[in-house]
A protein has these predicted regions:
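Short glycine- and acidic-rich boundary segments immediately preceding or forming the N-terminal edge
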Residues: 8-65
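C-terminal accessory segments enriched in acidic
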Residues: 8-33, 175, 202-414
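Active-site-proximal beta-strand/loop segments in catalytic clefts of secreted hydrolases
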Residues: 56-57, 70, 81, 133-136, ...
């Protein structure tokens, strides 16, 4: 058998990356895939004796919240996703991981790397996994961060006012997992440090007290994150960030770390031209299985916490579009300034897609900020049907010496 501890150093992340499409769950192709789509996949797991599927509780609106168990190992690992209903990226990746664990492949004749079979065997032999995908199904259906009660579940670890929050704490106390993965999405405009690099993936070993001390429980999380970061840096160099570690006494991640489970937070952000987050889904698949392998093999013990501390802190340094040094006419005034524009999503009720509405959010000196797209507009002026200003929709033309250079339509360059 190939030693996975050695294999990891030689590129387990590359093998997982190259193999993801084999295990891609084809019933889920968009972020807003809906509760029933996930239920259908979970019900399908019951056909395989590898999985024990049970209804852990019901949501406020009566939807089932499932607990999926697999593996026979001593080390217990619990993973939950979508405690915020509009944060689905990791749920998609978990569906792919279910396919990997049950060795459910696509219909291609593509040869499977034998290292993946060894990985699967090691994970299931050394670990017992507990998955809770879509912990907030009511929020997922309504496409909102909050539960049906209007409560942010990740601020309910103490008050326990939601059935979903009550379940999460009960599972942690009953199962006593050694390791936990708290899986979220974040605003896609966060940057990795004060840079123009979108923080496509961000990690955090959550703090368990106000002074953010590092005990053995939290140190293990930092070490695992180092390996996960190494796996995805190959594909998103300088686009991995570290979430702010300020202690939040009401949050589950902070409390679960305090209760003795090594807790790893993963936040999926933005990646250019990936509105449905299918590429970020792939990176979740790679990073999660890498992290699980490090737990199963205990390879994380070889990692240095210093590498975790070197990850750049997330910053809000990015807009969707920045137009620099453009000439603007407003009333009797003519001046040169930068424009910062964002396109904001709005869910369409009952549908699996979104509409977008652009807005000019800043006018002035944007030299310390970055745009996912940028235009250097020196010598250009804005021509628009209506006078532009803060809050205006970004519909206009950029003209230089009477010649049309760019058309901006709803915040996009055409």
């Amino acid at each position: 058998m190939i030693s996975l501890s050695t294999t990891y150093a030689q590129g387990l992340g590359e093998i997982l990356y190259d193999s993801h499409e084999i295990y891609y769950e084809k019933t889920i192709t968009k972020r807003r895939f809906g509760y029933q789509t996930l239920v259908n996949r979970i019900e399908g797991l019951k056909k395989n004796n590898l999985f024990e599927v049970s209804i852990a509780t019901k949501s406020t609106e009566g939807r089932n919240i499932y607990l999926i168990k697999c593996g026979t190992g001593k080390t217990k690992v619990m993973l939950w996703s979508q405690m915020h209903g509009d944060e689905p990226t990791a749920t998609m990746a978990l569906a792919d991981i279910f396919n990997f664990l049950e060795n459910k492949k696509d219909s291609s004749t593509r040869k499977i790397n034998p290292i993946l079979d060894n990985l699967r065997e090691e994970l299931l032999k050394k670990c017992t996994f507990y998955f809770v995908p879509m912990l907030n199904p009511d929020g997922a259906e309504a496409w909102t961060r909050y539960t049906n009660l209007g409560i942010d579940m990740n601020r309910d670890a103490l008050a326990l006012q939601t059935p979903e929050g009550q379940l999460l704490k009960q599972l942690v106390f009953d199962l006593k997992p050694d390791f936990g993965f708290n899986l979220h999405d974040k605003n896609r405009r966060y940057s990795a440090g004060q840079s123009g690099n979108l923080a496509t993936i961000s990690f955090l070993a959550t703090a368990y007290n106000q002074t953010e001390d590092v005990n053995p429980t939290r140190k293990r999380a930092m070490q695992i994150i180092v390996g996960m970061n190494q796996a995805v840096q190959l594909y998103i160099p300088n686009a991995v960030g570290r979430w702010v570690s300020d202690f939040e006494p009401r949050a589950f991640g902070d409390n679960i770390q305090k209760w003795g489970t090594t807790l790893i937070l993963i936040e999926s952000g933005g990646y250019k031209n990936d509105p449905e987050k299918q590429y970020i889904r792939k990176l979740n698949f790679v990073s999660l299985l890498t992290g699980l392998q490090m737990i199963a093999s205990k390879y994380y013990k070889k990692k240095s916490v210093k590498e975790y501390e070197q990850l750049p802190i997330n910053s809000k340094a990015i807009y969707d579009l920045i137009i620099r040094n453009v000439t603007i006419k407003k009333g009797e005034s003519i001046f040169k300034a930068d424009l910062a524009i964002n396109r904001n999503e709005r869910p369409v009720k009952g549908k699996d897609y979104f509409t977008n509405s652009s807005e000019i959010e800043e006018i002035g000196d944007m030299s310390v900020f970055f745009g996912t797209d940028e235009i250097e507009a020196m010598g250009m002026e804005i021509i628009a049907e209506k006078e532009i200003g803060l809050g205006s929709k970004a519909d206009f033309q950029l003209v230089k010496e009477g010649k049309l250079i760019y058309t901006i339509k709803n915040g996009r360059i055409e």
